[in-house]
Amino acid sequence: MRMEVVLVVFLMFIGTINCERLIFNGRPLLHRVTKEETVMLYHELEVAASADEVWSVEGSPELGLHLPDLLPAGIFAKFEITGDGGEGSILDMTFPPGQFPHHYREKFVFFDHKNRYKLVEQIDGDFFDLGVTYYMDTIRVVATGPDSCVIKSTTEYHVKPEFAKIVKPLIDTVPLAIMSEAIAKVVLENKHKSSE
């Protein structure tokens, strides 16, 4: 009898018995499923250039190496890149005081040059301190005509439910818009120079 009581108390402690009805209901402590909220954000920018012209900048390993020169002055307090700018390269970015996020690191995970898309994963930084467990940007260049395309950018992130209300106002499409506009500017300037 004593052993059964110890066993029931132990099972109640690790959560394998519903205490109210004493019904076995699995092993939640051992097989815990944490629910996370998945959020998708979208940005699109139409560009008066061919998809191949835009992808030649967006998909280039040179892009990561020259990022501070392409973006508005003062956007980074510190910028370092590990790698050659291609798959596996890591961008370590620190922003000026007073900005949030103040710091994060991104990794170029995948480039598909045939279909003109890439995956860029945020691997650590301030958002992860606020309950974000996954953060991935997908950038696609989609042809809409022989001399026009759309840069379609998506941010997908997962956040613990208790942090969702805090994080939602902090993550937006502004970084995607800034990057797309910088890419379009370079492409259109190059196109203009070549037509002179």
Curated annotation (Swiss-Prot):
GO biological process terms on file: abscisic acid-activated signaling pathway; alkaloid metabolic process; defense response
Activity-regulation annotation: Not inhibited by O-phenanthroline or EDTA.
Reactions the enzyme catalyzes: (4-hydroxyphenyl)acetaldehyde + dopamine = (S)-norcoclaurine + H2O
Enzyme Commission number(s) from the entry: 3.5.99.14
Active-site residues, record numbering mapped to chain: K118 (proton donor)
Stored SUPFAM superfamilies: Bet v1-like
InterPro entries reported for this sequence: Bet_v_I/MLP (IPR000916), Plant_def-hormone_signal (IPR050279), START-like_dom_sf (IPR023393)
Molecular function in Gene Ontology: (S)-norcoclaurine synthase activity; abscisic acid binding; protein phosphatase inhibitor activity; signaling receptor activity
GO cellular component terms, A-Z: cytoplasm; nucleus
Transmembrane segments: none
Binding residues annotated for dopamine, in chain numbering: Y104, R105, E106
Enzyme class: hydrolase
Residues binding (4-hydroxyphenyl)acetaldehyde, per UniProt: D137
Record's signal peptide: 1-19
Pfam families: Bet_v_1
Entry keyword set: Alkaloid metabolism, Hydrolase, Signal
Stated role: Involved in the biosynthesis of the common precursor of all benzylisoquinoline alkaloids such as morphine, sanguinarine, codeine or berberine. Condenses dopamine and pyruvic acid or 4-hydroxyphenylpyruvate.
Family membership: Belongs to the BetVI family.
Protein name: S-norcoclaurine synthase 2
Annotated source species: Coptis japonica (Japanese goldthread)
